[in-house]
Regions:
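C-terminal ends and interior cores of transmembrane alpha-helices
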Residues: 104-134, 385-407
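Intracellular loop-helix junctions on the cytosolic face of multi-pass helical membrane proteins
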Residues: 1-28, 167, 195-331, 335-341, ...
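Cytoplasmic membrane-interface "Motif A"-like loop-to-helix N-cap segments
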Residues: 93-109, 302, 370-389
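Central cavity-lining transmembrane alpha-helices of secondary-active solute carriers
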Residues: 74-92, 109, 154, 188, ...
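Short amphipathic helix-loop junctions that connect adjacent transmembrane helices
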Residues: 52-72, 326-349
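Transmembrane alpha-helices of Major Facilitator/SLC transporters
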Residues: 80-82, 223, 281-293, 343-374, ...
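Cytosolic juxtamembrane N-terminal segment immediately preceding the first transmembrane helix
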Residues: 2-44, 123-137
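Glycine-rich segments within core transmembrane alpha-helices of 12-TM secondary carriers
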Residues: 79-80, 171-191, 198-199, 206-217, ...
Length: 533
C-alpha cells in the first residue's frame, strides 16, 4: 500500500536486512514471526470458517440444487488455488510482499463481511423457487473478493516468513513449523465456532465471525509491520510509484487491475462451464509446453524426472479432488445422514481434519526421520501411493458404516474414522509436494513447473465440484428420506473408494521403477515440513 512502512523507501541496509540477527526476539525467534503467525491464523480462520458453511448456505438459504451448489463451490476452490500464482508474480516483480499482503487482506475483509449480508431466504411457491437477485449477486461478488484476496495474501505471507531468517539459520525450519501450526489452529477453531454460530444462530453470524477474524488479521499485520525489519519491501519502489497513465502510479494501476480480477472471478463463479474450458485450455498448453521442452532441451535424466513429476501431479489431482469432498458432498451427507447428537452441526465435522493434523503431524515428522535413518523411508511416489489408498479407504469406511444402518442414519464414528484416514493420507502427500517440484524441476523451467503444480491444485478443486455434483440429491418441497439419500451417496462413495484404492495400489507397484528415474534428484526426508493448504 502507499502508507509509510519501515524501510519501504529503500533497500534494507546490512544492519536492517532480514537475514541479519533480529533486534527483538520472541521465544528465540524473530518477533516478526508472531505477527505473521497471528495474521495467517486469522486469515485461515476466516477462510475455513466460511468454507465450513458455504455448501449449506447455498443449499439451505438460497435453495440451490446440490449439483449447482457443488459446481459453485468447486469453481471457488479452483480459483482460490489458481490466483496465488498471479499474486506471487505481482509481488515479486512490482508490489513487494508487504503491500501485496495488505491489499489481499483488505480484499478478504470486503469479501467476508459481504458474506454476512445474507438477505431473505429463498422460498418455493407453486413449485418455483424465488430468491433475491441482489443478494445472490452479493454472494458471488463476495466470493470473488475472497478469491483475489487469497491470491495476493497467501503466497506472499509465507515468503515473508522465510525472509526473517538467513538461509542457513538453524531456526528456519522450526519457524515454519510454528507458522504452519497457526494455519491449522485457525482452521480448527473456525470450523467449530463459525459453523456452530452459522447453523444455530443464523448464517450472518457465522460469516460475520469469519469477517471479524480477517479484520483482526489485517489489524495485527498493519500494527506489527515494524517488527518485520523491512522484509517484503518492493523490489523497486521508485518504479512502483512512477506515474504511468491517467495520472496514476504503477502501484495504483496494479490495485485497479486487482479489482478488475475480482469482476472476472465474479463472472467465472456464475459460469462454471466456461471456467472448466479455460482451465482445460490453459492446462493443456502448460503441460504441452513442459513436455515439448523436456523433449527438445533436456537430457534423458532430466526428461525422466519431469515426466515422473507430471505423472505424480495427476495422482495429486485425484487425491485432492476426493479430499475436497469434505466441503461439499461430505458436508451434505453429514447434514442428511449422520447421527450428530445435540451439540455438533454438519459443518463442525470439518474440524476433525485440522485437529488430527495438529495431533499427528509431529508423530509423522518423527516417523519419517526414524524410517530415514534406517533406510526404510518410502520414496516420494510411494508416499503419493499411500495417500491415494488412504483417501480411498476413507470412503470405503463410510460405505461399510452405511451398510450397518437400518434407517438411513450413519453413526458419527464412521465419518470421524474417514477424516482420520484422509488426514493421514494428507500427511503422506502434502509435505512432499512442493519439495518434489523444487527437487525434480530443471532449473531453466523451475518457475514454470511450480506454476503447473499450483494449476494441478486448481484442477483438483474444479474436479472435486464435478464429483460432488454427481452425488446431487433431489431437493424441493419434499426432499428425499434419509434412506433414499443414503443410497445415492453410498453408490458414488463406493465408486470413489474403488478408483482411489486401485490407482494407489498401481502407483505403489510402480514406485520402485519411478524412483529409479528420479534417484538423481532425491534428497533426505521431508519430515520437517507440514501440510500446507
Amino acid at each position: 500500500m502507499t502508507g509509510k512502512e519501515p524501510s519501504a523507501n529503500k533497500e534494507p541496509s546490512a544492519s536492517e536486512h532480514p537475514g541479519s540477527e533480529p533486534e527483538r526476539t520472541l521465544l528465540g525467534h524473530p518477533a516478526g514471526l508472531a505477527v505473521l503467525f497471528l495474521t495467517e491464523m486469522w486469515e485461515r480462520f476466516s477462510y475455513y470458517g466460511m468454507r465450513a458453511l458455504l455448501i449449506l448456505y447455498l443449499t439451505k438459504h438460497f435453495l440451490l440444487a446440490d449439483g449447482t451448489s457443488s459446481l459453485i463451490f468447486g469453481s471457488y476452490v479452483s480459483l482460490v488455488y489458481a490466483m496465488p500464482v498471479l499474486g506471487g508474480l505481482t509481488a515479486d516483480r512490482y508490489l513487494g510482499l508487504h503491500r501485496a499482503v495488505m491489499f489481499g487482506a483488505i480484499l478478504l475483509c470486503c469479501g467476508h463481511l459481504g458474506m454476512a449480508f445474507e438477505g431473505p431466504p429463498a422460498t418455493i411457491t407453486g413449485g418455483e423457487i424465488h430468491r433475491s437477485a441482489l443478494h445472490t449477486q452479493t454472494l458471488y461478488l463476495s466470493l470473488a473478493f475472497i478469491i483475489i484476496g487469497v491470491g495476493f495474501l497467501k503466497p506472499n505471507i509465507s515468503t515473508i516468513v522465510g525472509r526473517l531468517y538467513p538461509a542457513d539459520d538453524p531456526r528456519r525450519d522450526s519457524g515454519f513449523t510454528i507458522f504452519y501450526m497457526g494455519i491449522n489452529l485457525g482452521a480448527f477453531v473456525a470450523t467449530l465456532a463459525c459453523a456452530w454460530l452459522g447453523e444455530n444462530w443464523g448464517w450472518r453470524w457465522g460469516f460475520g465471525l469469519a469477517g471479524v477474524g480477517m479484520l483482526a488479521g489485517l489489524g495485527i499485520f498493519h500494527r506489527g509491520r515494524g517488527l518485520l525489519k523491512g522484509a517484503g519491501a518492493p523490489p523497486d519502489l521508485k518504479s512502483l510509484q512512477t506515474r504511468v497513465a491517467g495520472g496514476l502510479t504503477r502501484e495504483h494501476w496494479i490495485y485497479a487491475l486487482g479489482l478488475v480480477a475480482v469482476l472476472v472471478a465474479w463472472q467465472f463463479l456464475q459460469h462454471a462451464g466456461e471456467l472448466g474450458v479455460a482451465l482445460g485450455i490453459f492446462g493443456a498448453i502448460s503441460v504441452g509446453y513442459v513436455i515439448f521442452f523436456s523433449i527438445r532441451e533436456c537430457n534423458s535424466a532430466e526428461r525422466s524426472s519431469i515426466l515422473v513429476m507430471l505423472g505424480l501431479m495427476a495422482f495429486s489431482v485425484l487425491f485432492w479432488s476426493l479430499f475436497e469432498q469434505a466441503g461439499t458432498s461430505l458436508t451434505l451427507f453429514t447434514d442428511r445422514n449422520v447421527i450428530m447428537g445435540d451439540t455438533l452441526t454438519a459443518g463442525m465435522f470439518q474440524s476433525f481434519n485440522a485437529g488430527f493434523i495438529m495431533l499427528l503431524a509431529p508423530l509423522f515428522s518423527v516417523l519419517w526421520v526414524w524410517l530415514n535413518r534406517r533406510g526404510w523411508e518410502p520414496s516420494t511416489p510411494a508416499k503419493f501411493a499411500l495417500a491415494t489408498v488412504q483417501v480411498g479407504l476413507g470412503f470405503a469406511v463410510l460405505v461399510y458404516g452405511a451398510n450397518q444402518s437400518g434407517d438411513g442414519r450413519v453413526a458419527a464414528i464412521w465419518l470421524i474414522t474417514m477424516y482420520l484416514l484422509h488426514t493421514t493420507g494428507e500427511l503422506c502427500l502434502s509435505p512432499v509436494g512442493l519439495s518434489m517440484v523444487t527437487r525434480l524441476s530443471v532449473a531453466r523451467i523451475a518457475s514454470m513447473m511450480m506454476g503447473v503444480w499450483f494449476l494441478s491444485s486448481a484442477f483438483a478443486g474444479y474436479a472435486g465440484g464435478l464429483i460432488a455434483s454427481a452425488m446431487a440429491v433431489p431437493t424441493g418441497d419434499a426432499p428425499l428420506a434419509p434412506a433414499e439419500s443414503l443410497s445415492v451417496y453410498v453408490s458414488v462413495f463406493g465408486d470413489l473408494a474403488l478408483i482411489a484404492i486401485i490407482a494407489g495400489c498401481a502407483l505403489l507397484v510402480l514406485s520402485p521403477w519411478l524412483r529409479r528415474f528420479m534417484r538423481h534428484a532425491e534428497t533426505p526426508t521431508d519430515a520437517g515440513q507440514s501440510p500446507v493448504r
